Amino acid sequence: MGSVLGLCSVASWIPCLCGSAPCLLCRCCPSGNNSTVTRLIYALFLLVGVCVACVMLIPGMEEQLNKIPGFCENEKGVVPCNILVGYKAVYRLCFGLAMFYLLLSLLMIKVKSSSDPRAAVHNGFWFFKFATAVAIIIGAFFIPEGTFTTVWFYVGMAGAFCFILIQLVLLIDFAHSWNESWVEKMEEGNSRCWYAALLSATALNYLLSLVAVVLFFVYYTHPASCAENKAFISVNMLLCIGASVMSILPKIQESQPRSGLLQSSVITVYTMYLTWSAMTNEPETNCNPSLLSIIGFNTTRPIPKDGQSVQWWHPQGIIGLVLFLLCVFYSSIRTSNNSQVNKLTLTSDESTLIEDGNGRSDGSLDDGDGIHRAVDNERDGVTYSYSFFHFMLFLASLYIMMTLTNWYRYEPSREMKSQWTAVWVKISSSWIGLVLYVWTLVAPLVLTNRDFD
């Protein structure tokens, strides 16, 4: 009897696996918009992929991965292939994820509303999409080595560079929303309390940035060497100071009264993180001490024969993963009314979203029977670009690939080590990010004939 009931329970989920996104979460989540629930499920798809990729790097997994035909055949290098098989597995898994999201991105080009037949694919058929993703990933493991890893390294680097810029755009959006929320509460009442909170958050961000700069000069520079690190730290520090001063200039404040030091402090902290992340990828070990070696720990796995050690745990990678998760889930639930950021992320503003509880039509949030529903808030027009959202997840897959492998370039005939290319990608992204932030400040002054409200 219990087996029959269990089978019936499983069978009740079959329509959900082929139906829309809200059906999957309606039993365990509160009511919400269809557009938000769909993005959350795609983000969970990516999170599962990240977890599996992390498992691939666990010491001891190489014995299982070596069973895949052709994975380590006829490869001789400084580092034995069986030690680096986890890195190769991450490349193939992320390749499969990236191709899955790129396929969806191309399929969803110019979808304008949920009445488009392609929108049903975006918002439903979850079992088939999951099966497709798994099939692509499994197929990727049988791709001959050849130049695959080398070519995909450069593709991953370009994609990760773009995703870092998207992270910064979302960070700017978050900083603007944070500042606007606290300023509104400060104006409504209890102004001293909220003013103190605003001042404390800003001061904390700048204090963290100052401490980071001091530590960078202490541990990542030497009096007679590490000229590149000295230049990176100094230039980014001066650029952050310049952006902070610019944010409080009278002309900027006149055109954007809500701009201020809180946003600048958040951008400054992120810029310092990118600076540190870039320096940790330098090939010269004397200018690139690992964080754990600084505090007296070691996480390298020694290789029994002649060869180099392989570090399995990278602090900068952990921080990168945390920022990645925050970015992806924030992009899934955000309903920003910042018009400049919305134009960059191809998202409609908050006013286009159907408010919860408006009407009791076929797509109402609650049918009165206590069952959670989700409103179809995209019948008249999508609230975000389906194609761009999937393209962002495509870039996110590449960013994860580069982060988990610490931006190493793998070649069987050479050592597994950092590349200057990775350093310049991260440093240039920090500069472009600062330029984007400054542009959000000066755009209303430069383009006077456009409305930025």
Curated annotation (Swiss-Prot):
The modification Phosphothreonine is found at T352. Keywords: Endoplasmic reticulum, Lipid biosynthesis, Lipid metabolism, Lipoprotein, Membrane, Myristate, Phospholipid biosynthesis, Phospholipid metabolism, Phosphoprotein, Transmembrane, Transmembrane helix. It is a multi-pass membrane protein. Its main location: endoplasmic reticulum. Residues 2-39, 110-123, 173-197, 253-259, 331-387, 448-453 are cytoplasmic. The modification Phosphoserine is found at S351, S361, S364. InterPro entries: TDE1/TMS. GO terms for molecular function: acetyltransferase activator activity; protein-macromolecule adaptor activity. Highly expressed in the neuronal populations such as Purkinje cells in the cerebellum, brainstem and spinal motor neurons, locus coeruleus and raphe nuclei. The chain crosses the membrane at residues 40-60, 89-109, 124-144, 152-172, 198-218, 232-252, 260-280, 310-330, 388-408, 427-447. One of its GO terms (cellular component) is endoplasmic reticulum membrane. GO terms for biological process: membrane biogenesis; phosphatidylserine metabolic process; phospholipid biosynthetic process; sphingolipid metabolic process. It is found in: Endoplasmic reticulum membrane. A lipid is attached at G2 (N-myristoyl glycine). Residues 61-88, 145-151, 219-231, 281-309, 409-426 are lumenal. It comes from the Eukaryota. Belongs to the TDE1 family. Enhances the incorporation of serine into phosphatidylserine and sphingolipids. Interacts with SPTLC1. This is Serine incorporator 1. It comes from Mus musculus. The gene is Serinc1.
